[in-house]
Amino acid sequence: MVEKKVLEHLIDYLIDNRFDTFFLVTGGAIVPTVDYIGRKKEATYYCFQHEQSAAMAAESFYRTSGKMGVVLTTSGPGAQNLLNGICGCWYESIPCL
């Protein structure tokens, strides 16, 4: 019997609670997560070349659909590059995860 990983439980939880749109910047630290999202039929994902673009796309997604998007990136500098986009969401009171 293959047991589910914590990240699989987390992604399933998000999808079950209508957080089904993901904005991704791939990297070594999140390859298993991206792979799992890619295998989920219920999930929609968009890949970006820069973390700030992914965060701003999540902001635009909320503005146009009213649904909160999920931004995923790799650790280290990748996470740091999210700050401008996340701060923009915070200043505009736009929810993002």
Q: Could you say what each language-model-derived stretch is?
A:
Residues M1-L97:
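N-terminal alpha/beta PP-like core and its mobile active-site loop of ThDP/TPP-dependent enzymes
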